[in-house]
Amino acid sequence: KSEESNYSRINLQDSEDEIRKKIKKAKTDSSPIPGTIEELKDRPEALNLLSIYSFVISSTIEKTLNTMKGREFSKFKNDLSDALVATICPIGKKIKNLKNDQSYLLKILHEGTEKANSIAEKNLDKVKEIVGFVLH
């Protein structure tokens, strides 16, 4: 099995530079952005990037095509990078902060353990009653 390229995905903890580099290297063709989805049917890489952009900016692919029609992908990739950086980098920073806050993580683990034990105890009591292991 071949090793999956790190450029095949954008990770939540990627830096701004990593995101921009990955988008810049993303495969596209030399044709400009079309105006309709039908024109993208044989251009899966272009459709993928336009779909990602539409999702990140909370738009539809149709609206994105209408706005971007005729633009070169090299310029579009800058807009896509900006949108991804604005969305993903704050998440990555939050993840990093949470990972570095050991007391908070231990508190969450403790609360989760207590909640799980409470639920498990109730379920086990029900099972014992159904099976007949409960002494009255």
Label the predicted regions:
Residues K1-H136:
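Conserved nucleotide- and phosphate/pyrophosphate-binding catalytic cores
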